[in-house]
């Protein structure tokens, strides 16, 4: 992973790192800071043009991510920018976000909106490339629902499914949210050499057993580079970490605009992947305004999910059967602030 970060820092434009304060982005930021002093392009033989890494985080005022990111930035010595947004700013951006991300997937839109707002501010600072932590949760089973995996085989098969679909979800979010403002996002966890090694590990080494946290193997490998509170921080999905009230307000906003009668007619208005929540219906309506063809609707993945699971993983636990919310807080008994 260190080599992957080193390779991906090769750039002739100002760059930075996205730092949510979660384990994955913190590892990438810490590694990037170790290589920041010299130019990668000439095998580290001359001083870098931008010798100090700039890190970026976004959240509602007082959000968990902003506090955690500041802790990491102080520890690794990055020039940190903790950006805030309001719920109203997020709501105002939804139409543009859905246009740029080209999706009506609920969790993608929830997470893409603050990232889109962050990209706008990063662009204004002159940064043209950022490193990001996407991929680790898929490779190492970092989502909270992986706690419910019945055995190592099921755990591994789910990671494979998640990686195969990554371009439809998190990678689409990171790439398109940044590209909307002319910023390139690079993802070291998905470096081919690293991915080959990580997926060759025994699934039992990744399995979450009593006394372990998700991605324990990553936590142990990089514990000496991170503050202890970050190395032991529970997984927060990006849409949760920016502030729990963000998702709550999105759901409330949609409930005010979508009636029960609308939901009763959803399968007729949207015969392809009909939405099953008012929030999903609201996003789908905006998507249809931008992309009215049925073929566009068919390009968007669909299916029930708990905490970003694939539909196949819903069979792991009886508590998943009635769940249809992709937030990590939907995993009862695991998330500290579960619904």
Residue ranges of each PLM-predicted region?
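A short alpha-helix-loop-beta-strand transition element characteristic
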Residues: 228-236
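ATP-dependent adenylate-handling active sites, centered on carboxylate activation for C-N bond formation
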Residues: 1-226, 240-255, 263-339
């Amino acid at each position: 992973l260190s080599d992957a970060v080193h390779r991906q820092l090769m750039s002739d434009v100002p760059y930075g790192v996205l730092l949510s304060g979660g384990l994955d982005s913190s590892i990438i930021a810490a590694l990037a800071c170790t290589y920041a002093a010299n130019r990668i392009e000439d095998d580290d033989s001359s001083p870098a043009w931008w010798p100090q890494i700039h890190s970026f985080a976004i959240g509602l005022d007082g959000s968990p991510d902003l506090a955690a990111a500041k802790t990491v930035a102080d520890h690794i010595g990055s020039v940190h920018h903790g950006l805030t947004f309001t719920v109203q700013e997020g709501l105002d951006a939804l139409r543009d976000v859905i246009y740029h991300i080209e999706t009506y997937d609920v969790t993608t839109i929830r997470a893409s909106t603050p990232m889109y707002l962050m990209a706008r501010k990063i662009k204004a600072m002159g940064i043209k490339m950022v490193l990001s932590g996407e991929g680790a949760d898929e490779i190492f089973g970092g989502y909270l629902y992986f706690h419910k995996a019945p055995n190592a085989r099921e755990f591994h098969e789910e990671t494979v499914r998640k990686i195969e679909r990554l371009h439809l979800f998190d990678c689409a979010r990171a790439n398109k949210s940044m590209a909307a403002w002319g910023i390139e996002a690079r993802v070291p966890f998905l470096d081919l050499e690293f991915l080959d090694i990580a997926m060759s590990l025994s699934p039992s080494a990744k399995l979450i057993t009593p006394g372990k946290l998700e991605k324990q193997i990553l936590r142990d490998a990089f514990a000496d580079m991170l503050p202890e509170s970050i190395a032991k921080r529970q997984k927060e999905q990006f849409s949760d970490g920016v502030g729990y009230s963000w998702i709550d307000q999105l759901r409330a906003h949609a409930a005010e605009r979508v009636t029960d009668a609308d939901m009763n007619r959803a399968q007729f208005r949207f015969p392809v992947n009909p939405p099953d929540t008012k929030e999903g219906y609201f996003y789908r309506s905006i998507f249809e305004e931008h992309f009215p063809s049925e073929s566009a609707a068919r390009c968007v993945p669909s299916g029930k999910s708990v905490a970003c699971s694939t539909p196949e993983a819903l069979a792991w636990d009886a508590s998943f059967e009635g769940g249809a919310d992709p937030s990590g807080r939907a995993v009862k008994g695991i998330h500290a602030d579960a619904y």
